[in-house]
Structure formats: structure tokens, C-alpha cells
Amino acid sequence: MIFGSILLAFGSAAIATILGTTGAVGAFYSKKRVRNTLSVLNQVPVVNADVVTGFSICILIVVVFGVSKDTYIPLAAGHVVLSAPFVYLAVVPKLKQMDPSLYEAALDLGATPAYALFKVIIPQIASGILSGFVMAVTLSLDDYFVATYTKPATFDTISTYVVNATKGSQTQIKTALWALSTIIFIIVIVVEL
């Protein structure tokens, strides 16, 4: 369960980081109308309730596209859809801080657009990409609703396991979760000092 959740978090975060970064760079270098449209479309998963996102992903992938829910495809797609807008939102401010003349200078000096992208733009926005990746991992580990609607029946993420364990009368698990919560709370307080 823990290994599967971590693998899901890092895998979906990697895909979300690629999609979010690509979308942010593409929107940044697009015309204003396209940029504004992409920005508005990016906000839909952010302001939408996770329950609606999870249910919609389940309906779209399982019912419309006919992908079996026993695979991990709906779960991974749900986590990517949930996380990619946050990566986009982390990368866009770094693009606005960047000096656009450096990219143009690289092109004037004979660099191909792809070479200039990887050698000029990506290093300047690397901190935004990294923060977006960390946010995507955190969202994936924390998510309950999207995982509930899209996960296979035989798989539990950490969040679904914890919520399901606290619903029943499993007092040993509840006690262990309370102890774990106390330890995490103390660690957070110590780190903040």
C-alpha cells in the first residue's frame, strides 16, 4: 500500500510536471487570447471539487473510453488531472520573472528552439518546476476523493486506507493513527522552531 501510493505519487507527479511545464511555456509564448483561454481552462480543476473531478474522470475513462477500472490508468489519469494545474501555476510566475531577451539572443546566436528551451528557459524556471513537482507529489499522496472513484478494488492508497480504517470499529488502527498524528504534529512544531 505505501509503496504503491509512493509510486503512484511520483509517477503521476512526473507526468503532471511535464504537462504543466509544457502548458505554461506554451501559453507564455502564445498570443494573449490563447494565453488567457489556457489560463481560464487551467483554473477549472483547481476550483472544482475533488469529488466532481474524481467522478468525472471515472465516467470519462471507464464508461466513455471503455478502460477497465481494474487497471491503474483511471487512477493515474485522475491524479495527473488533479496535479497538473498546480504545476502550471508554479511555473507561470517563474516565466514572468525570466528575461525574454535571453531566449531571443540564443536563437539569434544560432541555437535551435529546442536547444534554447533546454539550455536557456528550463534552467531559469527550474525552481518553479521543482516546486510544482513537490506540490504534485503532495496532492497525490493527500488525495482521497479522486482515488476513491478511480482506484481498482484491490488497491488502497494511504489516504483511502486511513479514511476507511477510521470509519470502522478497528480501535488498534485508530490508536496507531492517533499516535502517528501526534508524532507528525510534534515534528512539524519542532521544524517550525
Where in this protein do the model-derived segments appear?
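Interhelical loop and adjacent transmembrane-helix boundary motif
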Residues: 1, 141-193
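Hydrophobic alpha-helical transmembrane segments of multipass integral membrane proteins
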Residues: 3, 7-19, 23, 49, ...
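Alpha-helical transmembrane segments of multi-pass integral membrane proteins
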Residues: 8-16, 24-27, 42, 46, ...
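Transmembrane-helix boundary motif in ABC transporter permease subunits
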Residues: 10-42, 59-63, 117, 193
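Membrane-interfacial helix termini and adjacent extracytoplasmic/periplasmic loops
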Residues: 34-36, 51-82, 114, 150-154
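Transmembrane alpha-helices
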Residues: 88-91, 98-100, 113-142
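C-terminal transmembrane helix and the adjacent membrane-cytosol boundary/short C-terminal tail
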Residues: 92-103, 107, 113-120, 175-193
